[in-house]
Amino acid sequence: MFNNILVVCVGNICRSPTAERLLQRYHPELKVESAGLGALVGKGADPTAISVAAEHQLSLEGHCARQISRRLCRNYDLILTMEKRHIERLCEMAPEMRGKVMLFGHWDNECEIPDPYRKSRETFAAVYTLLERSARQWAQALNAEQV
């Protein structure tokens, strides 16, 4: 059972906070948090990410970016990344995590979710669609696990 889930991207201001809140929407009983490999520590979510999420009735309010660490990783049963290279970086940092690190897009043909940072609103909207689809698929997989 995955009770503690960490979602990881680079800056922890666009993709991972959105994915975190989407998973929380589908599974409010789980502890879902996010962090970044190169986090903009202390920053809130990107304004465009906030706006796009709000269009889907998803709030990123109160988000505060934080840096991932080996120690932090130990607190989670499942760590979900946006890109395959993020898995590699996490496993270099903490080889013992290899068995619990997967792509956020795992159930969507191993889909990697591109970074929309400093890109157009349309890019943010497209990334939101990918995140929402993957979050739904994880929600279904997590439900199946509970049976």
From Swiss-Prot:
Its EC number is 3.1.3.48. It holds the Pfam family LMWPc. Disruption phenotype: No phosphorylation of Wzc. Loss of mucoid colony phenotype, greatly increased susceptibility to contact-dependent growth inhibition (CDI). The active site is at 9 (nucleophile), 15, 115 (proton donor). InterPro entries: LMW_PTPase, Ptyr_pPase, Ptyr_pPase_sf, Tyr_phospatase_low_mol_wt. Pathway: Glycan metabolism; exopolysaccharide biosynthesis. Belongs to the low molecular weight phosphotyrosine protein phosphatase family. This is Low molecular weight protein-tyrosine-phosphatase Wzb. The gene is wzb.
